[in-house]
UniProtKB/Swiss-Prot annotation:
This is Probable phosphatase KPK_3500. SUPFAM superfamilies: PHP domain-like (SSF89550). Homotrimer. GO terms for molecular function: phosphatase activity; zinc ion binding. It comes from Klebsiella pneumoniae (strain 342).
Length: 245
């Protein structure tokens, strides 16, 4: 089990079913030390208002030894790599994920998807790309992995892609893991939980990584400190409350 989970949704995204408190309780039960709440960006139909994201400042950083990161799963909106996270949202959040979602960016062709994803990474706003192995959004995998390494953006291996969403992602995700390995980049594991019961569940991710002999030293979830060092290297201010995580 990894002690960090970087992708989950609360009832603020109304197709999800758990609260912040639910996730804290489950993290304590499972031994998760650090997690990020990453509700959908405002351009999704059932996403929270941007006030939800800027008001995360009222959350405690640490509850009963569990660290909480303030995040978003933003939407890549166009071929220029624009995301629905800007202004005060950018400065209020610790972790900015970006990905393709059909209601915001209808599937197009491989070159368009690749150009848009690389542009989002090149913007400097994004720390992590969500479910890049989605077969509905094919990309040039070597080009994406090389760009992610160049811009220091993690590519996600998303556990729910192998269970309940994005059917047919396995081959793409194995290829992505191998390409990230060869490019010297980072992978991030996300449960993509829409209920707290699946927090920290990475069983299927582990199978993908094992299949390509992915190096443990390039997985951000191995420890809170590794993840925090990565975010700090990307400009996130150090968070004193997390010093002992």
């Amino acid at each position: 089990m990894y002690p960090v989970d970087l992708h989950m949704h609360t009832v603020a995204s109304t197709h999800a079913y758990s609260t912040l408190h639910d996730y804290i309780a489950e993290a304590k039960r499972k031994g998760i030390k650090l997690f990020a709440i990453t509700d959908h960006g405002p351009d999704m139909a059932d996403a929270p208002h941007y006030w939800h994201f800027v008001n995360m400042r009222i959350w405690p950083r640490l509850v009963d030894g569990v660290g909480i990161l303030r995040g978003i799963e933003s939407n890549i909106k166009n071929i220029e790599g624009e995301i629905d996270c800007s202004g005060p949202m950018l400065t209020s959040l610790d972790l900015i994920i970006a990905g393709f979602h059909e209601p915001v960016f209808p599937p197009q062709d491989r070159d368009t998807h690749t150009q848009a994803m690389i542009a989002a990474m090149a913007s400097g706003k994004v720390h992590m790309i969500s479910h890049p192995g989605n077969p509905k959004f094919p990309v040039d995998i070597p080009a994406i992995a090389e760009a992610a390494a160049r811009y220091q953006v993690a590519l996600e291996i998303n556990n729910s892609s192998f269970i309940s969403s994005r059917v047919g992602s396995e081959d793409n995700c194995r290829a992505i893991a191998a390409a990230v390995r060869d490019a010297g980049g980072w992978v991030a594991l996300g449960s993509d939980s829409h209920t707290a019961f699946t927090l920290g569940e990475f069983t299927e991710c582990r199978k993908i990584l094992d299949a390509v002999d992915f190096p443990e030293e390039r997985i951000l979830n191995v420890s809170p400190r590794r993840l925090l060092n990565f975010l700090e290297s990307r400009g996130m201010p150090a968070i004193p409350e997390f010093a002992d995580l």
